[in-house]
Amino acid sequence: MRFKGLDLNLLVVLDALMTERNLTAAARSINLSQPAMSAAVARLRTNFRDDLFAMAGREFIPTPRAEGLAPAVRDALLQIQLSIVSWEPFNPAQSDRRFRIVLSDYVTLVFFEKVVARAAQEAPGISFDCLPLADDFEELLRRGDIDFLIMPELFMSMHPHAALFEDKFVCVGCRTNEQLSEPFTFERYMSMGHVAVKFGNTRRPTIEEWYLLEHGLKRRIEVVVQGFSMIPPMLSGTERIGTMPLRLAQHFAKTIPLRIVELPLPIPPLAEAVQWPALHNSDPASLWMRELLLQEASLMVSPRAPVRLSAPGF
């Protein structure tokens, strides 16, 4: 099919190459043979009068011209998919939709497991692909490669989003850690060894670390882990402490001997929100899933302040 001299099928080829950066993988993703894919690349280069891709080993490296074309091509294909190809009434009871959702281990344990349980009742054919927090979430949203992103609202981009729930940060340590006795001061917090969380390949710090860095302060980090759920096991039998959301600390305190105390830092509450690609704003399946997320979030009880909290039996 041609539109003003351009074979529109070539746009699908260009999008696949931008995604896969490999000729064989791109051909497989759109069900073309490798010779047909090579011929399509040649036609793309002729049409746009640019090489579009340079070879580096087996990887296709896009030229500036290809980089400039890619966002418009992806947006056009998504609009066609959502507005024409996929547009139909959404029946959750009969749907086999698979949602791709980026979220943290914390959100999974304190919130999303309830969402999955409810979805199993209302939409048994629906499935979920839960992905770890990524450094390129803005690109994933722009390209429509994910359906939802759940993370602190503070870090969200300009795509549409909605607030889910709030939590507060607390300090945790082993039940036998006497340094967590009251009053637990800021000076003591800074003097102790910490188990800290850093996310993604770029090792992005958490909110409390941002607060300390902005005030020119540096704590003694002795262990770095990839998620909040890894903090409690690293504290057992040590004098180290960790900073994590209260809901998750209470979750682990049921099975791990933890002591939970107020965090001596004036940091704001942790406000979790859900974000989705702007192009999915009117997608019936996305609308249904958003409503389910918001309903489950509204059922969450606000966490109580840990005046002197610990595991049972302390």
UniProtKB/Swiss-Prot annotation:
Family matches, as Pfam families: HTH_1, LysR_substrate
Family matches, as CDD domains: PBP2_NodD
Taxonomic lineage from the root: Bacteria, Pseudomonadati, Pseudomonadota, Alphaproteobacteria, Hyphomicrobiales
Family of this protein: Belongs to the LysR transcriptional regulatory family.
Annotated ranges, domain HTH lysR-type: 6-63
InterPro entries: LysR-type_TF, LysR_subst-bd, NodD_PBP2, Tscrpt_reg_HTH_LysR, WH-like_DNA-bd_sf, WH_DNA-bd_sf
Source organism superkingdom: Bacteria
Protein name: Nodulation protein D 2
GO function term, MF aspect, one: DNA binding
Keywords, ordered alphabetically: Activator, DNA-binding, Nodulation, Repressor, Transcription, Transcription regulation
Function field: NodD regulates the expression of the nodABCFE genes which encode other nodulation proteins. NodD is also a negative regulator of its own expression. Binds flavonoids as inducers.
PANTHER family in the cross-refs: HTH-TYPE TRANSCRIPTIONAL REGULATOR LEUO, HTH-TYPE TRANSCRIPTIONAL REGULATOR LEUO-RELATED
DNA-binding region coordinates: 23-42
Source species: Rhizobium tropici
